Amino acid sequence: MSIPFSNTHYRIPQGFGNLLEGLTREILREQPDNIPAFAAAYFESLLEKREKTNFDPAEWGSKVEDRFYNNHAFEEQEPPEKSDPKQEESQIPGKEEEASVTILDSSEEDKEKEEVAAVKIQAAFRGHVAREEVKKMKTDSLQNEEKEENK
């Protein structure tokens, strides 16, 4: 006898979701034939890395997730600090120059990344269109052969 509509919620251990996300990402990236064996090898390699470097990705992920959901820094708005106008004037030009340089550098990098991504997307779409045309040509040729056989 089963209960079709249950309000039971299971608590997932902290970091477990991050481990499964990492495994899923690697499975999608590698496309293995034997997923359980791949998962075992993946978790074993994570254990080896944890022993060698004393870095636990599950623990790190749980801390990041906890910080994300429990960060109360932006709930209260602080008034801007008042300082001497002379100090502000001397500090602003240097900061503006640095900020503009980093913005330009990042925008150039972003443009390059966008161009590479656009080329990949266009190539994938062209490949898709070409495959559809080949599929259509095959079905047309099969239909023509069937018509010739029926005559």
UniProtKB/Swiss-Prot annotation:
Q: Where do the record's region annotations for Disordered lie?
A: 68-115, 130-151
Q: Which domain of life is it from?
A: Eukaryota
Keyword tags: Membrane
Localization, per the record, is: Membrane
Tissue specificity here reads:
Testis- and sperm-specific.
Q: Tell me the membrane topology, using the record's own terms.
A: Peripheral membrane protein
CDD domains the record matches: DD_CABYR_SP17, IQCD
What Pfam families does the record point to?
IQ, RIIa
Q: Which GO terms describe its molecular function?
A: calmodulin binding
Q: Name one GO biological process term.
A: binding of sperm to zona pellucida
Q: Is this entry keyworded Transcription?
A: no
Can you name a GO cellular component term?
A: membrane
Entry annotated with the keyword Lyase: no
Provide the IQ domain boundaries.
Answer: 114-143
Assembly and interactions?
Homodimer. May interact with ROPN1.
Per its UniProt record, what PANTHER family does this chain match? Answer: IGLOO, ISOFORM A, NEUROMODULIN
- What role is this protein assigned? Sperm surface zona pellucida binding protein. Helps to bind spermatozoa to the zona pellucida with high affinity. Might function in binding zona pellucida and carbohydrates.
The protein's name is: Sperm surface protein Sp17
Which gene name belongs to this protein?
A: SPA17
